[in-house]
Regions:
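Active-site acidic carboxylates
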Residues: 1-91
Length: 92
């Protein structure tokens, strides 16, 4: 397992908030299990963050037409990692 890395995909407000159309009501239940996995991987964790593209061309045009609430600047707080995920992204 020393060469194995944990990847935590998009633990962001946009997917966690109950007020977000993409929010999952089960999101709070993943925090403790991920905390335990992050500890077990001893610094070998990568955390991703979804942000909208700068240009809305190609397939993204239809996507943002459908999900207009997500058509925001990439620095909008809705795309921030949830507070609990901040330590997962820290580098020693």
């Amino acid at each position: 397992m020393s060469q194995t890395w944990l990847i935590v995909i998009d633990p962001q407000t946009i997917f966690a908030s109950p007020t977000s159309p993409w929010g999952s009501p089960a999101f709070p239940t993943i925090i403790d299990p991920i905390d335990r996995m992050v500890a077990a991987f001893h610094g070998r964790t990568i955390v991703t963050r979804w942000i909208p593209t700068a240009t809305r061309c190609g397939s993204w045009c239809d996507y943002f037409d459908r999900w207009t609430f997500a058509d925001r600047p990439a620095n909008d707080p809705i795309f921030d990692l949830v507070d609990e995920a901040q330590p997962w992204a820290e580098r020693p």
